[in-house]
């Protein structure tokens, strides 16, 4: 790069010297060697006098910047309305206050939460503790019945072996004399 810029500068100054000679000189190259070189026509630029800049190959940051911009956009797209909604709920509805339960009234499971958003989440997405308790008790009952049936099956197998009354005595075995072991001429013989 530097050699090309020096060559370019020398050629420009040579052309300027040859084309701009005076009329008084009759020889072809008369004033070329005696005259000063003109000022540089195309200056070499080295980017702020810090030497020659190198072209550093680095990965593109386009996709990273695009991802971060989209991430910021979608976080703000959902974050701003959520923040506004929570603020409005806290200002206009507020937290629940502890009060005496009336006689004969059974509160729902979501009524024990203080904040209205927690109450809505508990009412909409979660089951009540009674339902969870009944579900767990049903699972425990099914597993207990399975364990009891496994124990009964082991006891039945032990008694069948001890008494010799299993299904293996109900089928007569084939007499070995009926099997033909002679060489066959065809597969169907």
UniProtKB/Swiss-Prot annotation:
Function: Accessory subunit of the mitochondrial membrane respiratory chain NADH dehydrogenase (Complex I), that is believed not to be involved in catalysis. Complex I functions in the transfer of electrons from NADH to the respiratory chain. The immediate electron acceptor for the enzyme is believed to be ubiquinone.
Subunit-level organization: Complex I is composed of 45 different subunits.
Principal location: mitochondrion
Residue range covered by the transit peptide: 1-46
Membrane topology: Single-pass membrane protein
Record's GO cellular component terms: mitochondrial inner membrane; mitochondrion; nucleoplasm; respiratory chain complex I
Lineage: superkingdom: Eukaryota
Subcellular location: Mitochondrion inner membrane
Name the UniProt record assigns to this protein: NADH dehydrogenase [ubiquinone] 1 beta subcomplex subunit 5, mitochondrial
InterPro entries: NADH_UbQ_OxRdtase_B5_su
A Pfam family the protein falls into: NDUF_B5
Family recorded in the similarity comment: Belongs to the complex I NDUFB5 subunit family.
Entry keywords, A to Z: Electron transport, Membrane, Mitochondrion, Mitochondrion inner membrane, Respiratory chain, Transit peptide, Transmembrane, Transmembrane helix, Transport
Membrane-traversing stretches: 73-93
Key word Ribonucleoprotein present: no
The keyword Transit peptide is annotated on this UniProt entry: yes
